[in-house]
C-alpha cells in the first residue's frame, strides 16, 4: 500500500510528466550538465565533410559535378537541387552513424565538433539544398547514447567569411556586405534555439568558423557580430560555452574582450599551409608544435585548438582546393620542392613508409602534449575517403593516434 507521501509524490510526478510532454522536445532545457571549459580538458574530433562538404574529404561526391564543382555551392548548381538532394541525402545518412559516435567514445574522446552551414537553416534563392538538420538531430541522440558532448559549429556564413571551399562557397569574401551578417545572426539564432536546450549534450556552440581577418574581414564588425551571438546564447542557456574563432590572429590579441562571458577562443593550427613550416624536419615540427602550445598560454581565456591534424604535407588530393597542386612538390609559385608526395596523396596511413608512420605518430603526440597545456583540442577530422594523416579513424586503426589519447610512445615532448 502506498503511503500518503508516496501518493502525493506520484501525483506530482504525473503532473510533471504531462506538463513536460506538452512542451516540444526541441524547446525543452534538458538536465544541465555543462562543461567547465576553464578547467576541463577537451579531447575531441571534428565531423568534417559530413553536413558541410569539402572536395578533399569526399572526392567521390564531387566527381558527380565534373570540373566546375569546386565547393558545395557549385556542386549543387551543376547538379540541380533534385539530383544534389538525392546524392547528399545518401551521404548524410551513411557517412556518420551511431557506430561512429561509439568508436569516438571508445577512443577516449569527450567532444565532437559538428560543422553545419547557414543553408541548413535558410538559403533562399541559392543553389544549396537543405535537409541537414534531421541528421544533426540524430547526431545529438547518438552523442547522448555514446556519452559524448557536442559543439555545434556554424561553418559557413552567407557571402563566405573566408573565401575557402569549406565555407560552402570558394572565392571572394563577401561576408559583412549587404545583409549577410544579419542573415548569419538569424541562422545562428535558429541553431541555438534548436540545440542549446539539449544542454546535457550540446555544451557549446561556435559563432562562425575561421572568419578571415587577414583576408579582409573587418575585426570591429566581427566583434559586433560576436556581441550579438553572446546575447543570443545567454538568453537561451547561459551555461553554454561560446567558441569564438581568433580570426587567424594571435589568441592573445583577444585578451580583454568578452571576459567572464563563458567564451572559449578557438584557434586552428596546420603546418602544411605555411611555406616555412612545411619545410621542417620532424624534430623542428615537434618544436614548432610545442612553441605554439606555449603561445596560446598567453590568452586570458580558455583556448581550444579546434582544428589540427597529423599530416605534415599538403599532398592530399584536392586539399588546397579542387585540382590545385601542392606546395610540397614545388608546384606553387616561389615554392621550392620539398619532396615527393607518393602514397601521401590518397589511401590509408598503412601505405606510408615506416619513417612516415613514425613521424606521424610523433607529431600527433607532440601536439597533444602542447594543446593539453592549455584547454585541449579537436582533431580534424574523424573520417575521409582516404587522406593519410587526416583521418582519425584510420590513424587509430593503424596505431598512429594514441588510444587512449594520454598514451605516449615518445614521452612528453613539450616538457
UniProtKB/Swiss-Prot annotation:
Catalysed reactions listed for this entry: Successive hydrolysis of beta-D-glucose units from the non-reducing ends of (1->3)-beta-D-glucans, releasing alpha-glucose
Keywords, comma-separated and alphabetical: Carbohydrate metabolism, Cell wall biogenesis/degradation, Disulfide bond, Glycosidase, Hydrolase, Manganese, Metal-binding, Polysaccharide degradation, Secreted, Signal
Compartments (UniProt record): Secreted
Entry keyword Transferase: no
Record-level Gene Ontology MF annotations: glucan exo-1,3-beta-glucosidase activity; metal ion binding
Gene Ontology cellular component annotations, sorted alphabetically: cell surface; extracellular region
Active-site residue numbers: 210, 307
Cofactor: Mn(2+)
Enzyme Commission no: 3.2.1.58
Taxonomy, superkingdom: Eukaryota
Leader peptide range in chain numbering: 1-22
GO biological process, one term: glucan catabolic process
Disulphide bond pairs: 290-414, 315-341
Span list, region Disordered: 335-359
Subunit structure, as described in the record: Monomer.
Similarity comment: Belongs to the glycosyl hydrolase 5 (cellulase A) family.
Reported function: Beta-glucanases participate in the metabolism of beta-glucan, the main structural component of the cell wall. It could also function biosynthetically as a transglycosylase.
Descriptive protein name: Probable glucan 1,3-beta-glucosidase A
Annotated source species: Aspergillus clavatus (strain ATCC 1007 / CBS 513.65 / DSM 816 / NCTC 3887 / NRRL 1 / QM 1276 / 107)
Amino acid at each position: 500500500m502506498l503511503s500518503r507521501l508516496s501518493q502525493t509524490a506520484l501525483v506530482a510526478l504525473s503532473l510533471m510528466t504531462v506538463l513536460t510532454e506538452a512542451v516540444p522536445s526541441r524547446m525543452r532545457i534538458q538536465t544541465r550538465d555543462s562543461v567547465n571549459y576553464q578547467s576541463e580538458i577537451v579531447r575531441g574530433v571534428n565531423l568534417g565533410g559530413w553536413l558541410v562538404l569539402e572536395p578533399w574529404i569526399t572526392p567521390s561526391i564531387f566527381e558527380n559535378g565534373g570540373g566546375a564543382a569546386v565547393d558545395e555551392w557549385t556542386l549543387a548548381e551543376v547538379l540541380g537541387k533534385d539530383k544534389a538532394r538525392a546524392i547528399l541525402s545518401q551521404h548524410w545518412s551513411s557517412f556518420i552513424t551511431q557506430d561512429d559516435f561509439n568508436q569516438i567514445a571508445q577512443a577516449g574522446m569527450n567532444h565532437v565538433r559538428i560543422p553545419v552551414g547557414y543553408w541548413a537553416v535558410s538559403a533562399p534563392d541559392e543553389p544549396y539544398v537543405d535537409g541537414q538538420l534531421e541528421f544533426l538531430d540524430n547526431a545529438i541522440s547518438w552523442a547522448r547514447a555514446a556519452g559524448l558532448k557536442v559543439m555545434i559549429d556554424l561553418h559557413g556564413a552567407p557571402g563566405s567569411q573566408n573565401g575557402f571551399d569549406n565555407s560552402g562557397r570558394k572565392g571572394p569574401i563577401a561576408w559583412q556586405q549587404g545583409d549577410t551578417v544579419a542573415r548569419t545572426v538569424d541562422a545562428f539564432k535558429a541553431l541555438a534555439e534548436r540545440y542549446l536546450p539539449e544542454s546535457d549534450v550540446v555544451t557549446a556552440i561556435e559563432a562562425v568558423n575561421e572568419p578571415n581577418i587577414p583576408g579582409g574581414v573587418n575585426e570591429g564588425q566581427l566583434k559586433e557580430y560576436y556581441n550579438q551571438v553572446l546575447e543570443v546564447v545567454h538568453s537561451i542557456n547561459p551555461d553554454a560555452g561560446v567558441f569564438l574563432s581568433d580570426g587567424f590572429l594571435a589568441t592573445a590579441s583577444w585578451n580583454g574582450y568578452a571576459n567572464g562571458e563563458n567564451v572559449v577562443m578557438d584557434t586552428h593550427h596546420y603546418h602544411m599551409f605555411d611555406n616555412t613550416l612545411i619545410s621542417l624536419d620532424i624534430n623542428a615540427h615537434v618544436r614548432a608544435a610545442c612553441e605554439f602550445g606555449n603561445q596560446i598560454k598567453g590568452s586570458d581565456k580558455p583556448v581550444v585548438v579546434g582544428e589540427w591534424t597529423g599530416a605534415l604535407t599538403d599532398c592530399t588530393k584536392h586539399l588546397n582546393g579542387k585540382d590545385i597542386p601542392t606546395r610540397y612538390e614545388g608546384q606553387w609559385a616561389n615554392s621550392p620542392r620539398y619532396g615527393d608526395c607518393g602514397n601521401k596523396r590518397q589511401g590509408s596511413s598503412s601505405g606510408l613508409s615506416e619513417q612516415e608512420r613514425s613521424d606521424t605518430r610523433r607529431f600527433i603526440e607532440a601536439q597533444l602534449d602542447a594543446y593539453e597545456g592549455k584547454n585541449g583540442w579537436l582533431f580534424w577530422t574523424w573520417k575521409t575517403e582516404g587522406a593519410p594523416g587526416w583521418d582519425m579513424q584510420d590513424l587509430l586503426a593503424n596505431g598512429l593516434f594514441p588510444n587512449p589519447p594520454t598514451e605516449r610512445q615518445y614521452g612528453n615532448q613539450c616538457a
